[in-house]
Amino acid sequence: MSADVTEGSDRCPSGVYLKCWYNSLTLARSVDGGRTFGQPPAPRHLIAAVPYRYQPDVGPVGLFQPSNVVRRSDDGHWYALVHAQAFGAQREGTCVMRTADLRDPGSWRAWDGSAYRVRFANPYESSGTGGRICAPVSFAEIAGMTHSLTYNTYLDEYVLVGPSSRPGHGRRGVVHGFYYSTSDDLIDWTPRKLIREVTLPTSFECGDPNPAYFPSLLDPDSPSRNFETTGQRPYLYFTRYHFKDCHSTLNRDLVRVRVRFSR
């Protein structure tokens, strides 16, 4: 991921970081087991971007929060989810993208509503939106969830986990927390269900419990090198923040909790 922000300059007259956030997806490769990463020279490192050039004080704009990458055994492609912010012709939600060659950043194609035909382009090298806008999937069911994607061998389905919210029952207001959804094709998802109710950084109000974020399902017993699979009893990992005087600090904990799926 990349974000070009210069606060308080002519690139961001307001000096407000979020309003001047433009995000795209880029390729980084490691040849030493993840110790270090390198990128092809720009712009050949670009994987995906919205077909609009940067504009100050209209953000955040772009493609955000990519999931981990999983390989489907039935077609040999590698898949990932990405959150698209609403801007121009781009609708907000979760987009699905795939490639047959992880080494080629230009080989990724996104779902357009009926097939994987969206070919991302560098907005500084070309113009127009035709064939360059991804179609969000199952918005009512998963909203913009993308954080953690695994194939669950117990459920025999893909499992998506992410921070979200839903209206509560009875007199309860909105319920914030970590939710999950399942799918057999990465396009059609079940209505998200609550795993763990937590305060989110985006919903925090002074006096609330310390928030948590970045949920991921990981299974230490996964045979996948990149933990692409989970079983019946994986761990839910997440980051717990420690706020001070109602403001975020860099004091954060990595927490894990065992969860159990049932059919």
Which residues make up each language-model segment?
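Short linear interaction motifs
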Residues: 60-63
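Beta-rich carbohydrate-recognition and catalytic domains
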Residues: 1-57, 73-142, 151-206, 222-263
